[in-house]
């Protein structure tokens, strides 16, 4: 054993925001609703990359179409404590002023009822102005099959969406759905600061294990830029060292000019 154990590297919470632009909603809202339902309900909502908050224009096609894809029986979560946490988290969100249930339903309260039945998928909705005013009450991850739609005014110059996005903390992923030609640079620049993986026209739950994958994000998503998926995940156990003016013989072989390792 070592007197200097490896430091903890872990994932804390991640909302994995999704932004749907007015153009994307108008041209593909019904399809996006079906895909969102599949994404946030996958594995009973227990993926760390679950889309937990989705920004949609007011009066969106997506919101109207989503309820028909949400439902079914209760799903068993990994542990009783996770089930209880889901129940408590959903009820706390639903009780927040300005938040409403738009798909699914809340189970009867009480630990016995929820532990017995499991977790039922739920979709909540709230206006972007409420999120900007009360981010701590709404922008908190609930582990399980729930997502929150945030409605923004599409004709207000993007100010409402921008303020709501500014209230977000770091996530593993951020996703953008936009129609060709829509001006999305301000939104994209904000999403880049929020997440370690930025997706276009997709959903974040799938995580391919390959060299190109990056599974980490700004605090509070992870404690390290690299975590548990992809070939570069080993870097979470590494510490960078720079050598300045070192003679060749004192350098690790991988850094020597004569390249003895033929890298």
Q: What are the functions of these language-model segments?
A:
Residues 3-10:
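Short, small-residue-biased leader/transition segments that mark boundaries at the very start
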Residues 8, 56-172:
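NAD(P)-dependent aldehyde/semialdehyde dehydrogenase
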Residues 11-12, 34-54, 70-75:
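Active-site PLP-lysine loop of aminotransferase-like
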Residues 12-15, 35, 47-50, 118, ...:
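Short, solvent-exposed loop/turn segments at the edges of secondary structure
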Residues 17-20:
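Long, acidic and serine/threonine-rich low-complexity regions
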Residues 44-47, 51, 75-84, 100-105, ...:
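Flexible, glycine/charged-enriched surface loops at secondary-structure junctions
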Residues 251-263:
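Extended hydrophobic packing segments that form well-structured cores
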């Amino acid at each position: 054993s070592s007197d200097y154990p490896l430091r903890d590297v872990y994932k804390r919470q991640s909302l994995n925001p999704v932004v749907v632009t007015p153009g994307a909603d108008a041209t593909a809202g019904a399809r996006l609703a079906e895909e969102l339902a599949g994404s946030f309900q996958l594995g009973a909502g227990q993926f760390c990359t679950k889309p937990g908050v989705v920004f949609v224009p007011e009066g969106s096609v997506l919101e109207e179409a989503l309820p028909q894809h949400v439902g079914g029986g209760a799903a068993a979560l990994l542990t009783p404590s996770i089930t209880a946490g889901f129940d408590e988290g959903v009820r706390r969100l639903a009780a927040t002023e300005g938040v409403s249930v738009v798909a699914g339903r809340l189970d009867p309260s009480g630990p016995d009822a929820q532990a017995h039945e499991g977790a039922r998928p739920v979709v909540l909705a709230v206006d972007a102005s409420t999120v900007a005013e009360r981010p701590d009450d709404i922008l908190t991850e609930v582990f399980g099959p729930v997502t929150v739609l945030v409605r923004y005014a599409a004709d207000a110059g993007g100010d409402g969406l921008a303020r709501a996005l500014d209230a977000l903390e770091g996530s593993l992923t951020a996703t953008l759905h936009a129609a060709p030609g829509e001006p999305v640079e301000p939104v994209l620049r904000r999403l880049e600061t929020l997440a370690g993986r930025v997706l276009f026209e997709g959903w974040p739950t799938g995580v391919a294990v390959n060299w190109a994958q990056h599974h980490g994000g700004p605090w509070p998503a992870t404690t390290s830029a690299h975590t548990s998926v992809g070939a570069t995940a080993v870097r979470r156990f590494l510490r960078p060292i720079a050598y300045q003016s070192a003679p060749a013989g004192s350098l690790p072989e991988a850094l020597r000019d004569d390249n003895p390792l033929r890298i």
